[in-house]
């Protein structure tokens, strides 16, 4: 497949499908189309009833992604690729999923909250943990919740007769995946009912605790009584 931008590895593509809960018929915004590897993976999972809307800031990347998709899946696929900057906003609404392969996805978090349907999922792919930390801070200060970050390490095994061991090489870190869900706001609680004023309790009668002591003193002073 002709490439311009670096593609997302198959081990991460599979994790995106599962953890972003990509389902047949979903409406998905993908930004950072690059060479179209994730785009093709999504289209195969969505089926003919779904739709992928791509936002790609570079015209050459957008063209390459379209050509790669057509070469592998044909021209009749539910895909729209627009040359635009997702950092400036998202016009689409009621989306099911938003998938980002961008240097600064935290700038998209406020736009994503307005474009996703409630319960929709935001998923971002990032190469460095410092980028992840910035993204997670933005998510924590937004309407998103249930956030998690992970990476996928793929290790194959050498299996030949009784020789069974891990291969000497593995596809380890390629990127971090962060997934969060747009939560439904909690309903406003009704005001607490007014409690009727209750009259003050009657003061208890004063008890003369000294009375018994005085009587005893009088008896001792007058033994003949």
Say what each PLM segment does.
Residues 25-34:
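Conserved class I S-adenosyl-L-methionine
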Residues 140-145, 154-225:
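Core SAM-dependent methyltransferase catalytic element
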């Amino acid at each position: 497949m002709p490439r311009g931008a670096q593609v997302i590895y198959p081990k991460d593509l599979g994790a995106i499908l599962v953890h972003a809960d990509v389902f047949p018929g979903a409406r998905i915004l993908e930004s950072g189309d690059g060479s179209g590897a994730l785009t093709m993976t999504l289209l195969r999972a969505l089926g003919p009833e779904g739709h992928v809307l791509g936002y790609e800031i570079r015209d050459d990347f957008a063209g390459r992604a379209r050509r790669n998709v057509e070469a592998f899946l044909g021209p009749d696929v539910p895909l729209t690729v627009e040359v635009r900057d997702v950092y400036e906003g998202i016009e689409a609404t009621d989306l099911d999923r938003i998938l980002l392969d961008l240097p600064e996805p935290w700038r998209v978090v406020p736009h994503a909250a307005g474009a996703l349907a409630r319960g929709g999922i935001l998923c971002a792919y990032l190469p460095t943990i410092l980028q992840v930390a910035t993204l997670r801070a933005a998510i924590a200060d937004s309407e998103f919740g249930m956030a998690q970050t992970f990476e996928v390490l793929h290790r194959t095994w050498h299996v030949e007769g009784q020789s069974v061991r891990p291969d000497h090489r593995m596809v380890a870190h390629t990127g971090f995946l962060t997934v969060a869900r747009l939560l439904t706001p909690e309903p406003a609680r009704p005001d607490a009912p007014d409690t009727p004023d209750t009259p003050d309790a009657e003061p208890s009668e004063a008890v003369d605790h000294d009375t018994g002591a005085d009587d005893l003193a009088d008896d001792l002073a007058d033994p003949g009584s």
